[in-house]
Swiss-Prot record:
It catalyses: N(tele)-phospho-L-histidyl/L-threonyl-[pyruvate, phosphate dikinase] + ADP = N(tele)-phospho-L-histidyl/O-phospho-L-threonyl-[pyruvate, phosphate dikinase] + AMP + H(+); N(tele)-phospho-L-histidyl/O-phospho-L-threonyl-[pyruvate, phosphate dikinase] + phosphate + H(+) = N(tele)-phospho-L-histidyl/L-threonyl-[pyruvate, phosphate dikinase] + diphosphate. Its EC number is 2.7.11.32, 2.7.4.27. InterPro entries: Kinase-pyrophosphorylase, PPDK_reg. It comes from the Bacteria. Keywords: Kinase, Nucleotide-binding, Serine/threonine-protein kinase, Transferase. ADP binds at residues 151-158. Bifunctional serine/threonine kinase and phosphorylase involved in the regulation of the pyruvate, phosphate dikinase (PPDK) by catalyzing its phosphorylation/dephosphorylation. One of its GO terms (molecular function) is protein serine/threonine kinase activity. This is Putative pyruvate, phosphate dikinase regulatory protein. Belongs to the pyruvate, phosphate/water dikinase regulatory protein family. PDRP subfamily.
């Protein structure tokens, strides 16, 4: 056995990154460069553990491991002790402490953190998508969207896009304005992916008047007039009928409620939701 060079064996039933980072943090506290780290990820069988231990036995070694599967964790501890190999269980003390605080038991499934990371990045991607393709900014996004929302101004298109993005849905939205022809890409999107948003004209007048007030403008602007609102609603209704998409009245609904209806529509159609729900 070489007493000078330390070999740190990293064993994990996942990728082993946690154990390696802890080992590196610990070894940095010592004034030495005479060490080597060997990482062995995805250890799921006892015979793999046996192979690592036989190698470690020949050297001045320490085993640092993260095993959430209790059977494998116990096996490493027992076999390492028999062979007089130093071993450190990184995960179990943390699981034990958290289990006591939460009064529940851990799942003990390898790789869960990777799944959480993947879900997080899907959400970030969906949020970035919603921002990029909000308010008809770039019609090229319509073909890539999971959901396309259409409606006149102040029908909750943007809040709904962001809410659904937090459910990992890529959402684009297109404003419908009588003076502006909808992009041709809108008619190329399958109608099953499009949701129309409408509202009560009285409610919309109130919302738009509040909007004008916030901007320091007078309520007399045509934007908040009944005549203009009815014109917009009629125009939007014609577009939605042409598309053949379902229409949701958002006038009395919170964003969460409207989003729930949209997701239910897609589930009923058999769409595989990105967040698996």
């Amino acid at each position: 056995m070489n007493n000078e060079n330390l070999v740190i064996y990293i064993l994990s039933d996942s990728i082993g990154e946690t154990a390696e980072q802890v080992a590196k943090a610990a070894i940095s506290q010592f004034d030495t460069e005479d060490y080597e780290i060997r990482r062995f990820p995805f250890i799921t069988e006892k015979h793999h553990i046996d192979e690592m231990l036989q190698e470690a036995k020949k050297e001045n070694s320490v085993i640092v491991f993260t095993m959430v599967v209790e059977e494998l964790r116990n096996y490493i501890m027992e076999e390492a002790e028999k062979m007089q190999i130093r071993s450190i269980d990184i995960m179990s003390p943390v699981l034990h402490a958290m289990g006591g605080a939460l009064t529940t038991t851990p799942k003990r499934e390898p790789g869960l953190i990777r799944r959480l990371d993947e879900k997080y990045f899907r959400k970030v991607e969906a949020i970035e998508f919603a921002v990029k393709y909000d308010d008809g900014k770039d019609s090229r996004g319509l073909a890539k969207a999971d959901i396309v929302l259409v409606g006149i101004s102040r029908t909750s298109k943007t809040p709904l896009s962001m809410y659904l993005a937090h459910r990992n849905m890529k959402v684009a939205n297109v404003p419908l304005v009588p003076e502006v022809t909808p992009p041709k890409e809108l008619y190329e999107v399958p109608s099953q992916k499009i949701i129309g948003l409408t509202t009560n004209p009285i409610k919309l007048i109130e919302i738009r008047q509040e909007r004008l007030k916030a901007l320091g403008l007078k309520n007399e602007a045509s934007y908040a007039s009944m005549e203009r609102i009815l014109e917009e609603l009629e125009y939007a209704e014609g577009i939605m009928k042409r598309i053949g998409c379902p229409v949701i009245d958002v006038s009395t609904k919170a964003v969460e409620e409207s989003a729930g209806i949209i997701l239910e529509i897609f589930r009923d159609r058999g769409y595989n939701m990105p967040n698996g729900r």
